[in-house]
Amino acid sequence: QYKVCPAVVAAWAEILRRAPSARLLLGNSTLKSIHNRQYVADQFAILGVEQDRLTLFGPADHYRFLQYYDQIDVALDTFPYNGGTTTMEAIWQGLPVLTFDGDRWASRTSQSLLRRTVLESFVAGDARAMVEMAVGLAHDPSTPETLARLRRSLRQELAASEACDTA
């Protein structure tokens, strides 16, 4: 899968290693295959992440897919190809997305959405800074309160933002 490349796996694995209570939920149509799920789990295992910290799921209808967001605290963006629809859906479901400024259009999609909402502080300068931001959130005692507030307000913030301005 081109979005979850080795650099992305390495960054996410570092977050998981440094935030022992964190888990990763990853969904993709290619994960329908048990072989592909095992391959992904093996890539994380090579980097020191136990398989029980990963939840991997394959295709799901849109309603079920949106329900997965209820199990997530913070969405982690891919790079160099960012989310587009998934970034919008995460924000719509009340989740901040951690991303960073990339060097091409396809790696700046998420940051352009976040900068048009109240989530500009979730845009890091690079992959290293994004990892540090994620680890910091995992260890910050105020994070649950911050995330609860965002979960309640992000849909309205997004709807009122430039990102949804149809004029």
Task: Name what the model sees in each region.
Residues 165-167:
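C-terminal alpha-helical cap of glycosyltransferases
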Residues 51, 69-70, 74, 78-162:
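Catalytic binding pocket for nucleotide-activated donors in carbohydrate/polymer assembly enzymes
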Residues 63-66:
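Short hydrophobic/charged patches on amphipathic alpha-helices used for structural packing
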Residues 1-61:
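Conserved catalytic-core segment of nucleotide-activated headgroup transferases in glycan assembly
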